[in-house]
């Protein structure tokens, strides 16, 4: 749009009637009164728009309009951030022992939050700068290896609140009426229920990873594990874990927290109003989801131990991948349409499109049905559930059947891959991914005869498992929703 920010007054029905022009007949005024209009809208409107675009703030001031109510949003979130900056400066030295570098980082961050929050009252870019300071505040305890749990928690909490009040709170309540669904879709992938399901899972993952990080940073002495005893300790102190320059569990906690924050940024049309945020949101979830499974694969193969909380956190991250994919696909379709119409994809990617457009009507659901729909696992077909169970069986087979050597490693790795592929394919838009399980099944047909370390009956068990995996993943399963042009890819 030409106006800065979003205009809450433009509605689709206004666009529909905008072509209904009525030309006034001024011939009698000319003939009887000799009157002619001094200004022409056709000539004046381009000049008005040029003046608005060149200096929006001055244009609003000259015309006695309130630009802040149109673009910047309310002032109270930025005032709260100023108070949070004061809190950070005033409490950092009262929380106990703190590393000098982290102390100066917190003091500088508090001052920066106050300064840029004041600027954010008039400049939108300053709010995003405050957001960046909040991100640094959440990351600093990891970079400086905070030995004080209170300091770490204080920085995490203040950083998350600063991001919330800088860029999330000012946008709340600005959703226009309408479904917000992309063209050809039967639901809105950016709907609040869809995103809140991811936020809920992200917070579960955050608390799990934060607990594991507490052990790595020295905040607790002994990590709790209900099934594998000292396995968690050995995993968290392994060479794989120490290869990271920071606490890998703390890095996971930060990733989960960013997922939760990114999940609530933007309106219900952010698939087209904030494409960059949707892509960033997908990058926060999809690559870490795959990486977490890789780390789980390395536990028994490279370390020789299991970690219960690590497994649960990985499952949580994996469950977040499916509901995040559809929003990324919707944004990809939007950018592709922009390219086909000749628009600058780079500009559209960063600025989005806030103009009114025809939106498909979507089926209304009850709150419970909407919640179940937002979590893909509840609508996954039976064959993918069985494939997941096969993957779990393969991961447990080395222990249950006393497999050793390369046979045990191969079986465990294939099992983890099958679980990953099956859970990702729970999402209808990602259903073609299930075909990778057929390759895993084919590998099982061969691996039992190639590697050594199995029991006498293992080759036949591997063959039966591989054939079952191939058979289960031939079927796509029912596709209940519509996904525009992506429908052809699913089938």
What do the predicted segments below correspond to?
Residues 71-75, 79, 120, 124, ...:
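Conserved beta-strand/short-helix segments
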Residues 90, 96, 101-105, 145-146, ...:
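Membrane-interfacial helix-loop segments of redox and metal-homeostasis proteins
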Residues 130-137, 437-444:
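Central hydrophobic cores of alpha-helical transmembrane segments
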């Amino acid at each position: 749009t030409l106006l800065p920010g979003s205009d809450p007054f433009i509605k689709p029905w206004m666009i529909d009637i905008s072509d209904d022009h009525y030309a006034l007949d001024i011939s009698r005024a000319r003939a009887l009164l000799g009157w002619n209009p001094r200004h022409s809208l056709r000539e004046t409107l381009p000049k008005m728009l040029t003046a608005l675009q060149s200096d929006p703030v001055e244009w609003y001031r000259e015309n006695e309009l309130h630009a802040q109510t149109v673009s910047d949003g309310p002032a109270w979130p930025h005032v709260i951030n100023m108070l949070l900056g004061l809190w950070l400066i005033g409490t950092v030295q009262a929380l106990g022992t703190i590393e000098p570098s982290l102390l100066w980082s917190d003091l500088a961050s508090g001052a920066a939050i106050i300064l840029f929050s004041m600027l954010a009252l008039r400049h939108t870019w300053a709010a995003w700068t405050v957001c960046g300071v909040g991100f640094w505040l959440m990351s600093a305890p990891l970079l400086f290896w905070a030995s004080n749990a209170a300091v770490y928690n204080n920085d995490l909490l203040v950083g998350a609140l600063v991001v919330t009040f800088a860029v999330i709170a000012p946008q709340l309540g600005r959703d226009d009426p309408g479904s917000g669904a992309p063209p050809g879709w039967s639901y809105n992938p950016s709907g609040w229920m869809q995103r809140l399901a991811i936020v809920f899972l992200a917070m579960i993952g955050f608390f799990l990873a934060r607990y594991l990080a507490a052990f790595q940073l020295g905040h607790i002495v002994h990590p709790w594990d209900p099934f594998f005893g000292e396995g968690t300790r050995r995993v968290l102190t392994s060479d794989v874990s120490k290869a990271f320059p920071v606490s890998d569990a703390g890095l996971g906690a930060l990733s989960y927290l960013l997922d939760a924050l990114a999940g609530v940024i933007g309106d219900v049309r952010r698939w087209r109003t904030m494409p960059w945020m949707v892509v960033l949101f997908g990058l926060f979830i999809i690559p870490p989801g795959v990486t977490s499974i890789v780390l789980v694969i390395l536990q028994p193969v490279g370390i020789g131990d299991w970690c219960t909380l690590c497994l649960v956190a990985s499952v949580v991250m994996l469950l977040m991948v499916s509901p995040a994919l559809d929003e990324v696909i919707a944004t990809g379709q939007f950018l592709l349409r922009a390219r086909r119409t000749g628009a600058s994809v780079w500009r559209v990617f960063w600025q989005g499109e806030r103009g009114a457009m025809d939106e498909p009507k979507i089926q209304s659901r009850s709150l419970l049905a909407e919640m179940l729909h937002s979590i893909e696992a509840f609508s996954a077909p039976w064959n993918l559930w069985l494939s997941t169970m096969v993957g779990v069986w393969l991961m447990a087979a080395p222990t249950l059947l006393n497999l050793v050597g390369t046979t045990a490693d191969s079986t465990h790795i294939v099992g983890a891959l099958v679980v990953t592929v099956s859970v990702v394919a729970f999402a209808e838009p990602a259903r073609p991914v299930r075909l990778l399980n057929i390759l895993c099944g084919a590998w099982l047909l061969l691996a039992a005869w190639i590697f050594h370390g199995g029991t006498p009956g293992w080759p036949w068990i591997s063959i039966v498992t591989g054939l079952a995996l191939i058979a289960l993943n031939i079927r796509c399963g029912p596709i209940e929703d519509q996904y525009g042009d992506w429908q052809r890819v699913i089938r």
